[in-house]
A protein has these predicted regions:
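Short, Lys/Arg-enriched N-terminal segments with co-localized hydrophobic residues
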Residues: 2-19
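Glycine-rich, acidic/polar active-site loops that bind/position phosphate-bearing ligands
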Residues: 18-464
């Protein structure tokens, strides 16, 4: 891991930062003119992590960068009520990029926005503002939060109503094949991402048919959340240009593993990796151990956020390399937290891997609750449980109970029940998002419960 480059709290370099912000605004305006940009898309997300956008002309951009652009917040589910509809989108010029996919009507660019109330205060329903607030809490303790995700997804033929998903290949882990459409799509996606300033570390074919993984290089949490939103759109855009459907649904196929988004986490203090201790047997500092302990203690509470769909829990089952048990170990992929063994002497690479999240999550909210859980462990001095280095999938319930190893929630309903009682999650998300999220996801669960599935028809229709 590299030392942090972006800090979000107040500091003595305010004037210097203002000057840098002004320079970035000038760069954006100059680039728009030089590249012949015809439209600038202002991006933000709703509470569930769906990417939203409206476009402005270059003539409006300078005003937007200075004062923001108003829009009707009541048109975004979970944002505003009709009687208090208007909100303000203020572009973050650090996120400006020209979109690399071709548009016959002219070049387009995008910039992420922070959403504010009209009086200039942060808007409670903006997930990006929620993450910034939680990052500020880390800064007050002297930490910068870094993340590197391993993002899995599937390519399918264009879906037809009533038909099962049709994979494009039957490959497995690390398969090297002759030229095929899925591999070509992955390569083109990587080129697209790097054109947009999103560096890629690894990419390969995953275990399931037509399943692929792209791992992004670590960066600060806010930049990474923006990058994940861009990543999901880029994967879909590239696939759609070739009449292929890309999906981040956690478990689209039964009988094979689902798609996860393992998160490699670290804290930096100044230029030092706060998770590293060369004198420790695991090279883990007390800070790292308390952070891990916080994640383990609050894991069940944050699972509804990191795994927010009904379908998410069909991935979190034994036998498919997804975590089920709340435990940690070095290089053991059956637990919730894995501690990768870095190359010898590489203090910067010391990190932990949190393995339960899936790529359907809202990264701004997921990073917020993960950070809040870890910081709670640090602030209150939580003790890290004993390492569970056995294959947990092969252990009996009795043996797991002896080790006091609990399970993650087994359904969205279970996860919501636990989340609803969590003071930590309520504080991390804020009252508005916390309550709206629970209402929305309760409605999703009720809708799911009324469905009669093919499994039930095949099992019961003839026999009962």
């Amino acid at each position: 891991m590299c030392p942090p480059v972006r800090i979000y709290g107040k500091n003595r370099h305010t004037e210097e930062m203002s000057e840098m912000l002004e320079q970035q605004r000038e760069y954006v305006l100059r680039t728009v003119e030089e590249r012949g940009v015809r439209l600038v898309r202002l991006w933000f997300t709703d509470i569930l992590g769906n990417l939203k956008s409206f476009a402005i002309s270059p003539a409006e951009l300078e005003n937007a960068l200075e004062d923001g652009m108003t829009f009707d917040g009541s048109s975004i589910e979970g944002f505003s009520r009709v009687q208090e509809a208007d909100v303000l989108a203020i572009p973050d010029p650090n996120t400006f990029e020209v979109l690399p996919w071709a548009d016959p009507k002219g070049t387009e660019a995008r910039v992420f926005c922070n959403i504010h109330n009209l009086d200039g205060t942060p808007f409670d329903a903006d997930p990006r503002q929620v993450l910034k607030r939680n990052l500020d809490a880390a800064v007050k303790l002297g930490y910068a939060f870094y993340i590197a995700p391993d993002i899995e997804y599937f390519y399918f033929a264009p879906p037809q109503k009533g038909e099962l998903p049709q994979p494009l290949d039957e490959g497995g882990f690390f398969d090297l094949t002759t030229s095929d459409i899925a591999t070509s799509l992955r390569k083109e996606t990587i080129r697209t991402l790097e054109t947009m300033g999103i560096p890629v570390e690894y990419s390969f074919h995953e275990d399931a048919p037509s399943q692929h993984e792209i791992d992004l290089r670590h960066t600060d949490a806010l930049t990474m959340a923006d990058s994940i939103m861009t990543f999901r759109l880029a994967v879909r855009e590239v696939a759609a240009m070739h009449n292929v459907h890309a999906t981040f649904m956690p478990k689209p196929l039964e009988g094979v593993q689902g798609s996860g988004m393992h998160l490699h986490l670290s804290l930096f203090k100044g230029e030092d990796n706060a998770f590293y201790d060369e004198k420790d047997a695991y090279n883990l500092s007390p800070t790292a151990k308390s952070f891990m302990a916080g994640l383990l203690r609050h894991a069940a509470e944050i699972t509804a956020v990191t795994n927010q769909t009904v379908n998410s829990y069909k991935r979190l089952v034994p036998g498919f390399e997804a975590p089920v048990h709340i435990s940690w170990a070095r290089n053991n992929r059956s637990g919730l937290i894995r501690v990768p063994v870095p190359k010898k002497g590489n203090a910067m690479a010391t990190r932990i891997e949190y393995r339960s999240p899936d790529p359907a999550t809202n990264p701004y909210l997921a990073f917020s609750v993960i950070l809040a859980a870890g910081l709670r462990g640090i602030e209150q001095g939580y003790t890290l449980p004993v390492e569970a280095d056995a294959n947990l999938f092969e252990m009996s319930d009795a043996d797991l109970n002896k080790l006091s190893i609990e399970q993650l929630p087994q359904s969205l309903a279970d996860a919501l029940d636990i989340m609803e009682r969590s003071e930590l999650v309520a504080s991390a998300l804020g009252e508005h998002i916390f309550e709206w999220f629970l209402r929305n996801k309760r409605a999703e669960w009720r809708g799911y419960k009324t469905q009669v599935t093919p499994f039930e028809l095949n099992r019961y229709l003839r026999s009962l």
